[in-house]
Design a protein with these regions (language model features):
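Second-shell residues forming the walls of enzyme active-site clefts
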Residues: 1, 90-173
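Short acidic, glycine/serine/threonine-rich loops at helix termini
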Residues: 16-20, 75-78, 121-125, 168-170
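N-terminal beta-rich core of secreted/periplasmic extracellular enzymes
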Residues: 1-76, 84-108
Length: 173
């Protein structure tokens, strides 16, 4: 096969295929389970990854842009319930489990929205968003989930469409 086919199919409100596909929950539900039972939440994340991989492969989709690695700061309705959690360690752990499930199903993963979209309220599909936080703040918070997943071997990263004014006056993606 010479052509890679990708889709936004992460679960919750960003699930492009619905008919005859498993209804994948929004990722913050797994984060809520994590608060009560980490082991169970990780099993669920892995199973969801496997389901996504198996169902998409059955219709010749090579990969999905998932998981969302953003921190849920409670500010962004665009990210919000798409994020696993508001803390870095649970995000990294649950995303790792989801990726393990994707890989078990023969699918690679693409983490998003580098270097972090959870702090921004603006919908970057309709408006220009600017994150004026110092680079050090972004590096010591938002980027840590990406760094953690890069260390374990995530195969792709999708940038956000945000201007990080402490770095550049152009959008990152």
């Amino acid at each position: 096969k010479n052509l890679l086919v990708a889709v936004y199919h992460e679960g919750g409100r960003v699930q492009r295929f619905k008919d005859e596909f498993t209804n994948i929950p929004k990722m913050n539900l797994i984060g809520q389970i994590y608060q009560k039972d980490k082991k169970h939440a990780n099993k669920i994340a892995k199973l969801i990854g496997w389901i996504i991989a198996e169902e998409l492969a059955a219709v010749d989709i090579d990969f999905s842009f998932t998981p969302v690695l953003d921190i849920d700061y409670g500010a962004s309705s665009v990210i919000g319930d798409r994020a696993f959690h508001q803390d870095i360690d649970p995000i990294s752990e649950l995303a790792s489990s989801l990726i393990e499930g994707l890989n078990f199903g023969g699918m690679q993963s693409v983490g998003k929205h580098f270097p972090g979209h959870g702090f921004i309220k603006t919908d970057t599909h309709t408006e220009v968003a600017i994150d004026d936080r110092p680079l050090e703040t972004i590096q010591n918070n938002d980027m840590l989930t990406f760094n953690n997943l890069i260390k374990i071997g995530i195969k792709g990263i999708m940038p956000s469409h945000i201007i990080y004014s402490s770095c550049d006056q152009n959008p990152s993606g």
